[in-house]
């Protein structure tokens, strides 16, 4: 873990390619974002897709065509400030570089989407144990049977993240995450996974499998920022760039600034 | 049902003993209250009990010793303004009169506690079906294994009301009822009834049994204003007066005035 509390300092290290790992826990009072960079011909459709699907795709940053800075989110150069990237061509990964200087061009537009880390800290601060954090694993994520609202060429299934919680913590987690509509907000489901098309809760499509459920634990499901990656895989644009899973953009925005109340 | 929207008009009818039935649906934008009237020697302990148990016993009105009015809640004479009362001696019901003029005395203090009707209307307005209202039955209520915080001679088990909801509505109902901490607030439990000591969900201790659960429905449990009646039954004060179940005090306070946000 990159143990730096200040987001500007953390980005400096990442910018120099001195840290190339996952960003969970780094500058943890600050918003981290999912990244998606697209050629201009796709930009309006993708913006529209985010607008129609605010729970999985909460847009917290929107660059100007050809401009690698994101002034709203801090002194950011998107070409260098993420630990690792993925370069996609027609839905396939062709490279996983540590900067994208050689891929950047004047036609690209940057999108930054909120991520659940922003409400996990308030959950932990409320005394709610988060299994995947305690085990230092990646949150289990599942492709559901729920269709996103399509926009232009972008369509696909909703991906959800899952946290096993007892009933009391499930209720409290609904209250707390409701305060953060800009980072997925309240859960979209709890209880029976098959109701949203999840066949095997122990076998997630993304992330690590959960531990066996305790008797009093129920699965609680939040819309997940991996949804756009899954949609990009399906929709197969000629070209796009995302962050590598878990290796997010660290911004200067406080998590608490995203709280609706 | 007493189909009057204005709480002052509704109380006038009740005051004249022209309506003696349950008050559900009457003046439904206004707060209705559970009633508890106690001799002064118990008043401080009961006030303390309410303070220690705000979820089941949210105190919304607190009279002055010997004074039957409740100016905070409207132009109320507590001796006449409830459709039917119960007179208790040592935990046993000895009378169920339509007014308490002959029982009132200078030593009595009135307590009014919030009730779940105040958040049921916002639930219905959010499109959430409430089974017991749709079936025109009384909400099922259960004595749990959860101890209230004792205060002086008052102690006993928490009573909960239960509404069967699908997962989506359960999540939404947690958000909506969280806005109303003064009337029980968020649920205290959902899912497995045995975790809170309920042996048979189809066999409630108070109110009417629920209908058979649909496949996608889970039981959602709120702290219930019947708790103080159950506690009074156990704690057996020499004398007390309550409302008869379902026949509540209608106040001039808007439900929306109780919303925390």
Curated annotation (Swiss-Prot), chains A, B:
Keywords: Lyase. The lineage of its organism: Bacteria, Pseudomonadati, Pseudomonadota, Alphaproteobacteria, Candidatus Pelagibacterales. This is Putative hydro-lyase SAR11_0660. GO terms for molecular function: lyase activity. It comes from the Bacteria. Belongs to the D-glutamate cyclase family. It is an enzyme of class 4 (lyase). InterPro entries: D-Glu_cyclase (IPR009906), Putative_hydro-lyase (IPR038021), UPF0317 (IPR016938). Transmembrane segments: none annotated. Disulfide bonds: none annotated. Its EC number is 4.2.1.-. The keyword Membrane does not apply. HAMAP family: Hydro_lyase. Gene3D superfamilies: PSTPO5379-like (3.40.1640.10), PSTPO5379-like domain (3.30.2040.10).
